[in-house]
């Protein structure tokens, strides 16, 4: 309900289930935001409705979105367009129409309040390249959708992702003193890629510093 239809009541329930109280969950949110480098974000509630001091920026939401797409199974929920609940008695429809209309789009989330206007963090993946776009302050849902569509088109038309390292690819070893083994390997917990312009046809070299 949270991922598909922006259910504010469900967001509160999830917060209370995970942290005991809304306040405790908000403290976790702010701590995680700080860890991710979201320097201009302060959360005051778990549902996102307008509240004094509850604020963020497009850049900070992009940082959060970049992390979100790496969370296991999250995109399985955000890409749902329609979902039945309570044995078919209720049907929720995703406010992010791009997951239905835009090729490769599988998230992430829309939002709207009287202060923020119509906002969206949208992501799409094609041919191994994934991009995230964030828009805030649109005047209508259609403007939000159309502008996000054009931004994603621009990304796919002008940029490409080049994978540098695979997940768990060993890039070096270090000696271990008095350990269970003589050496330990270094490897990324997720694939590592760089974004290049499509006009850049030059050779890419990787240098690993341990």
Question: At which residue positions do the language-model features occur?
Answer:
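Active-site-adjacent loops and short helices of periplasmic peptidoglycan-processing enzymes
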Residues: 1-72
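Domain-terminus/edge residues, biased toward the C-terminal soluble/receptor-binding domains
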Residues: 38, 50-210
